[in-house]
Amino acid sequence: MSKIPSVNIKALLDAGVHFGHKTSRWNPKMASYIYGKRDDVHIIDLRQSVALMNVALNAIYETVKKDGKILFVSTKIQASDIIAEYAEKCGQYYVNHRWLGGMLTNWKTIAGSIEKLNKLDKTLENEEALMGYTKKEILDMSRKKDKLLLSLAGIRNLNSKPDLLVVIDTNKEHIAINEAVKLNVPIVAVVDTNSNPDNVDYPIPGNDDSIRSIRLYCSLFADAALQGLEESMKASGVDMGAMQEHTDKGLTSKNVSKLKQAKKFSKTKNIDEETNTEFEQVLNDADENKNSDNA
């Protein structure tokens, strides 16, 4: 049986997941996820981050296991390359530059743009066909292709709406979230102390600005998706030796089943004692180290 990845408080702390924004920038709707404040910066309750991350990872795993498609979204500079790297690693889809309005709700128009991109690709790869164009025309086509690739590279093989949206920075990606809500697409999202968690089905309280934090999230998301892919392939009788090839190409199964939307989590009520003790200990250790440095 595949093992869904999990995370502990120490790993989150090392990645700086506990650092929120300045207290003056907070969103009161995040109050239940905040542990306290230090030096006018909110500290995120990593006990809840651990529990809710594990719930989100299970949602990702189950979606891919059922041949569902996941769309990773983050267009902020520090997340752009990381999102693409890990989405490609697990054979899923991504938007990492500009979210075009209607990417989900006006799919017909987006599909037309993808078709245009594919035609430009074919033309530019056909040396014989290019003989009929001037250098300026070829340059114009190359520029159009590059512009389309920026927005569509990660979804050019996506032929229908995704079954799950994974977002880093809900404020920046509010249009994507609104479109997903309209289409009843469940949402996994990292929610920082200035975020609104209302429309997020699987919130993960955490720092959404740190590169180390973002890389940790994406690594866990990709691993969960890969485990789901492995289970899906086993169920389909696919040779597991060919798994890497399938992962590189992305999911191509036409037998897509939508993940049933799970009950929405507003906060975690049952945090086990071991996790609680670990959180208190790592915070105390951090304080001791800080005091030692300032001595």
Swiss-Prot record:
Disulfide bonds: none annotated. GO terms for molecular function: structural constituent of ribosome. GO terms for biological process: translation. Keywords: Ribonucleoprotein, Ribosomal protein. One of its GO terms (cellular component) is cytosolic small ribosomal subunit. Residues 261-295 are annotated as: Disordered. It holds the Pfam family Ribosomal_S2. It comes from the Bacteria. Belongs to the universal ribosomal protein uS2 family. PANTHER family: 30S RIBOSOMAL PROTEIN S2 PROKARYOTIC AND ORGANELLAR, SMALL RIBOSOMAL SUBUNIT PROTEIN US2M. This is Small ribosomal subunit protein uS2. It comes from Rickettsia rickettsii (strain Sheila Smith).
